[in-house]
Structure formats: structure tokens, C-alpha cells
Amino acid sequence: MKVLVVNGPNLNMLGKRDKNIYGNFSHEDLVKMIEDWGRKNGVEVEVFQSNHEGKILDRLHRLDFDGLVINPGAFTHYSYAIRDALEIVKVPKVEVHISNIHRREEFRRRSVTAEVCDGQISGLGVYGYLLALEYIKKKLEELT
């Protein structure tokens, strides 16, 4: 069982961004937390981060994973290319946001990518990733 975790633009800057919105975790801390979860749960996890839409598309197009957690960052609000790629990916998938996008600026409240995911977790900090991973693990176990 392999789960891909994709982080979009500016998520590499966690720990340097507004701590009231994004918390104190660095991207390195987030990767370690996800990898630790994978080891404890017997799940292979790969964390991929890019600030470039095309690189995210190329990674998704490899289709070499059984489940997907994606935080598209700002691409959430306007990337129909990522939306279309997510539609191609026929695995359990969850969109995650560290901040509650529904309590932020108006332009951040619309997700064009969530509607092609199984669900969206928003506003629970980095722990939203763990909830998404738990869901995907359970869903994959049900399918086997």
C-alpha cells in the first residue's frame, strides 16, 4: 500500500509563514510526522512538494500510488489542470488544508479541486494530514 502526499506552492515555507494561520510546524516537521505515521501503520508514504503546477501534474500522472493526500495550496482555487489530473487518478484521495479556507479571504473559500476528491479536511492544522491518511488506509483495506 503506497500513499502519495502532494504539497503545492509555498508549503515548503511552513514555519516561516503566519503562525496564527499555519502553525509552528516546518515542512520538514510535517514530512517527518507523515513518515513516522507510515512506519507505525505499515504504509509506504511518499511526500512530494513543488511550487510548479507542471511538476505536480507530472507526479500525479505517474499513477504509481494507491491513495492520495493533496494540499494544492493556492492552486486549490483556480487550477483546472490539477482538477483534471485528480479526476484521472482513480484512487481514494483527500484534499487537505492546514488553515480553515472557509474562514479566510473570499477568494480562498472556493476549491475547484475538492469536488473530484473523496473529501476535504480544512482547518485542523497539520493533523488534517493524519486524518486523511487514516481514511485512505481504511478505505484501501475495505477494497482488498
UniProtKB/Swiss-Prot annotation:
CDD domains (alphabetical): DHQase_II (cd00466)
Record key words, sorted: Amino-acid biosynthesis, Aromatic amino acid biosynthesis, Lyase
Binding annotation for substrate: N71, H77, D84, I98, S99, R108
Residues of the site described as Transition state stabilizer: R17
Annotated GO MF terms: 3-dehydroquinate dehydratase activity
SUPFAM superfamilies: Type II 3-dehydroquinate dehydratase
Keyword Plastid attached: no
Transmembrane segments: none
A GO biological-process term: aromatic amino acid family biosynthetic process
Subunit structure: Homododecamer.
Protein name, entry field: 3-dehydroquinate dehydratase
Organism lineage: Bacteria, Thermotogati, Thermotogota, Thermotogae, Thermotogales
